[in-house]
């Protein structure tokens, strides 16, 4: 009887411990803005000599532990999930260099779950860190992107939706790369709610409006703790 009682108590204790661990709420925050030197990766030698440009970066924390560097403003997708762009600290040293040469570059996008602390890397279609400046609305992101084909690379207008592998909108607007291209390549997208559509203008060219026909929001928000 004592043995059975002990096993029962052990089972209850284990279940309570597992439930407490699974329901643990994490604290997610971003730090203060820090300005760091930044040069466009495809800049000319003269442009690279100009060290006046900078990138605003902020640390991303989960439970007071830094998980990543970010840049730009975060976008609240739901009341518990937000998207934010990564900032990469890259060693740009050549094999012949004797010391590391660290540079900052904007990276891809991630989503962060405030409850579970889970961080997910987003693979937005045709997203190019040099070209793409995503503007969000709900779970949609609109931007100009690039993609390579057997005949070369092209520049596209892209509207992506989270959870969808293919772009909701993909419109060819030119070849890429372009000599002496504008920076930015495209102006920030402008969204309209009803009807759902977005206007994108390549810099120096005419703006075009695209109707967006997607699905209902399919952002997956789980309660599982991934030990972040």
Task: Annotate each PLM feature.
Residues 10-18:
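Hydrophobic h-region of N-terminal signal peptides that target proteins for export
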